[in-house]
A protein has these predicted regions:
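A structural signal for well-ordered alpha-helical segments within the folded catalytic domains
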Residues: 3-7, 68-75, 89-92, 176-179, ...
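Substrate-binding rim/cap in mid-to-C-terminal beta-strand-loop elements of soluble/periplasmic
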Residues: 7-15, 35-88, 92-105
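C-terminal cap/loop subdomain of S1 sulfatases and analogous C-terminal strand-loop tails that border
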Residues: 32-34, 81-180, 215, 235-237
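A generic secondary-structure signal for well-formed alpha-helical elements
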Residues: 10-13, 17, 22, 55, ...
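Active-site His/acidic residue clusters
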Residues: 30-42, 198, 220
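Metal-dependent active-site segment of extracytoplasmic phospho-/sulfohydrolases and closely related
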Residues: 1-36
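Long, internal low-complexity/basic segments
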Residues: 47, 161-179, 184-241
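Structural recognition of the beta-strand scaffold that forms the well-ordered cores
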Residues: 23-27, 50-52, 69, 76, ...
Length: 241
């Protein structure tokens, strides 16, 4: 069905003689429905596919390792259409990347996740520079709950296993340290947490500082931002007690 829909869209552009003068971008949603992927800030949960076609501009078959985010799409379309990108818009135009003028785009990528109201508030923030990923679990003393995962049959089978490896995997998913740091080039599945390894203390400090800087710029106060608030009538009752 997906292939057919994409093909139909491209065929319409071709029939209207617009294909050679149109930028087409296809992106996927992030993550698959497996523990350690969707609904997490690990790589498998935040990375997504992106394919672009722009005849005469993008050379067919080319790839880029530039760090880009969804927020870059709007300024890209405005730029391609000849408009001026407002300063208030997040993201940067991808035109230079598409034209092959640069191999880089953003220095860092940022990610946000929370599971409200599926369990205890469990806000997560993360940052990646393309080589290392830092994950900040803001309420590490809580147990992570994700309803979609826990309803899955394979989750129950994992939980029922009495092997050390199965328990290790389940515990890693449900109970997390405050900080996680991974070398995503050497450890693409992010199983070896380097956050407390002295050798990587400078990288941890750098990414933590940059993440906090971005959170401040986004008016993100952290855990308090994600905790669900009581309805106003309950707040009034509590105030009168």
């Amino acid at each position: 069905l997906l292939d057919q829909q994409v093909g139909d869209a491209m065929q319409i552009l071709k029939e209207k003689n617009l294909l050679q003068n149109t930028l087409v971008i296809f992106i996927s949603e992030q993550g698959t429905q497996f523990a350690g992927a969707k609904w997490t800030n690990w790589s498998a949960g935040v990375k997504s596919a992106m394919v672009a076609s722009w005849p005469g501009v993008i050379k067919p078959g080319t790839e880029t390792s530039a760090i880009v985010q969804y927020e870059d799409l709007l300024p890209t379309f405005i730029d391609v259409a000849g408009g001026k990108v407002p300063d208030v818009i997040d993201g940067k135009s991808l035109v230079d990347v598409f034209q092959g003028k640069t191999k880089t785009h953003h220095k860092y990528a940022y990610h946000v996740h929370n599971n409200v109201p599926e369990g205890p508030a469990y806000p997560i923030r993360s940052i990646s520079d393309g080589r290392y990923r830092l994950i900040w679990n803001l309420t590490p003393k809580e147990t992570y709950v994700e309803k979609h995962i826990e309803k899955a049959e394979w989750y129950l089978s994992w939980k029922a296993q009495d092997t050390d490896q199965a328990h290790k995997i389940m515990n890693r998913y449900k109970n997390r340290p405050e900080f996680e740091l991974y070398d995503i080039k050497k450890d693409p599945f992010e199983m070896n947490n380097l956050a407390d390894v002295k050798k990587y203390s400078k990288k941890k400090a750098e990414l933590t500082m940059e993440l906090q800087k971005w959170m401040k710029q986004q008016n993100d106060t952290g855990a308090d931002k994600d905790r669900p608030r009581a309805p106003k009538n309950k707040q009034k009752k509590a105030a009168n007690v």
